[in-house]
Amino acid sequence: CISIVLIIKKISPIYSLILGAIVGGLLAGWGLEQTVVEMVSGVKDITPAIVRILAAGVLTGMLVKTGSAETIARSIIKALGEKYIYLALALSAMLLTAMGVFIDVAVITIAPIAIITGNNLKLSKMKLLLAMIGGGKCGNILSPNPNTIIAAENFNAPLSFVMAAGVIPALIGLAVTVFVIVPLM
């Protein structure tokens, strides 16, 4: 609670978390030495997950900066054609986010293609955006994002297993987005 209040007050999140942990340890009756030992132990346990998260961020940057993300999106839209534009946009966003690209970056990457195609076909921008965001959320179920990485660490499960467990829910979400939600708009 102390950490959250300090962060809201614009205190550096790192210092806020450290101070919150120290106060929490002292209130638990650990004393300063035991509190510091527990803090170091906690950091040691979570460090591999943090390194994986940073690596996913580097991959995301490379996909966007090299133009690979846009190439993937254009290829999917070209393959499926204008008739299936909503599916193509949702699938593009899903695949990009499944590779670790954040939803906002995926949408910004795909949006210019969506807008041009949507204007040519006189489609609703809201439906185009909904398809991209829905697809992005489906990709998040599969991606090596911080939630997935930490879940794998905490359950002592291989990251690939946790990611694979999301395939069926992601595909169901994609189908619902494209064939149920978008047409209702």
Model-found features: residue ranges?
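Membrane-embedded alpha-helical segments and adjacent helix-loop junctions characteristic
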Residues: L32-N119
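Hydrophobic transmembrane alpha-helices of multi-pass, membrane-embedded glycosylation machinery
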Residues: I18-G25, I110-A114, G134
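Hydrophobic mid-bilayer segments of alpha-helices in multi-pass membrane transport proteins
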Residues: C1-L6, K10-W30, I50-V58
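Transmembrane alpha-helix interface/packing and boundary motifs in multi-pass membrane proteins
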Residues: S3-K10, T60, A93-F102, I133-G139
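Membrane-core helix-loop-helix motifs of multi-pass transport proteins
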Residues: I116-M185
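Residues that define the loop-to-transmembrane-helix transition and helix capping
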Residues: I14, K83-L87, M126-K127, S160
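Generic alpha-helical transmembrane segments of integral inner-membrane proteins
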Residues: C1-V5, I22-L26, L54, L91, ...
